[in-house]
Curated annotation (Swiss-Prot):
Pfam families: MG280. Signal peptide: none annotated. It comes from Mycoplasma pneumoniae (strain ATCC 29342 / M129 / Subtype 1) (Mycoplasmoides pneumoniae). This is Uncharacterized protein MG280 homolog. It is found in: Cell membrane.
Length: 287
């Protein structure tokens, strides 16, 4: 009974191991087969983030390199463009994260926990950036709505001479000679805007480039296929060789190559365990 249980347990473990490596081999094969789709999704996400960064950088560069007068409406319009890009980037990151979560069995072997953590941090940074941009837009909108010119109409033109580093150089009065109350509300804009750029740079540095992604993905998939396929092949070959090279006598299985020696050893073990049986056998042989 114990012999049967032992043999049954070994068979179950062998079959389970083969099934596990077969699944891993299938996942690796699927990863290679859908490589182009995975790369396209990643590239789209990366391009969206890069586009958002470029839009934000251009927005700041426009102010830094200009000595013209900008209207609140113009600023709001550009902020809305940047906000739109951030929302697109956030959506792309969420789609990428969703794809990973839907295929944990595959990507769990191809994407390290550190990279998944960086993806979460990148998404949080984008969400924080979006909140900041909305705050800036609301501040400017409130300032603009509260400003009236000499003729009682809204005056939205703000003489900004330069934004550089964390400083905004501005005129303290509008073209009509009245103090522009909106200036106070946007004095911190340069520092905040540069914070946005800094956040984007951190995001860009955390996310692998297109070339790096293809290298990581391909190496991970090939490694998964090679290791799982190799182990599975060894298990199958060893099982077949064991089956072809063995024969069963009673409840015991012996190797065809060394069956005589194995049977002799087995008989000796029985005789050593039961001395009276050995005496009976010897008496029978002497007759």
């Amino acid at each position: 009974m114990l012999l049967f249980i032992n043999r049954f347990a070994k068979t179950i473990i062998l079959l389970f191991g083969m099934l596990v490596f077969l699944v891993l081999l299938g996942l690796g094969g699927a990863a290679l087969y859908f490589k182009d789709n995975a790369a396209k999704l990643y590239i789209d996400t990366r391009k969206s983030i890069d586009s958002s960064f470029d839009s934000s950088q251009a927005f700041i560069d426009t102010y830094n390199g200009s000595s013209s007068k900008f209207s609140v409406e113009s600023i709001n319009k550009q902020i809305e463009e940047v906000k739109k890009k951030v929302e697109e980037s956030t959506k792309k990151l969420e789609e990428y994260e969703k794809q990973i979560n839907q295929a944990k069995g595959l990507n769990g072997y191809l994407v390290s926990p550190e990279k998944l953590k960086e993806l979460q941090e990148a998404k949080k940074s984008l969400q924080a950036t979006k909140s900041q941009i909305e705050k800036y837009a609301n501040t400017l909108k409130t300032a603009n709505n509260g400003k009236t010119g000499q003729n009682g109409t809204s005056s939205s033109t703000i003489p900004i001479t330069k934004i550089s580093g964390s400083t905004i150089s501005v005129s303290t009065r509008d073209t009509n000679g009245k103090t522009n109350s909106a200036l106070k509300d946007i004095q911190e804009f340069s520092t905040q805007a540069n914070d946005i750029i800094k956040q984007y740079k951190e995001i860009k540095n955390k996310i692998p480039t297109e070339k790096q992604f293809n290298e990581y993905y391909t190496i991970g998939a090939i490694t998964l296929v090679s290791v799982s396929g190799g182990v599975l092949a060894v298990l199958i070959v060893s099982t077949v060789m064991t089956f072809l090279g063995s024969k069963k006598l009673g409840l015991r299985t012996f190797s065809r190559l060394t069956s005589t020696d194995q049977i002799a050893d087995h008989v000796n073990d029985i005789l050593d365990r039961y001395p009276e049986l050995e005496d009976a056998v010897l008496e029978e042989l002497d007759q």
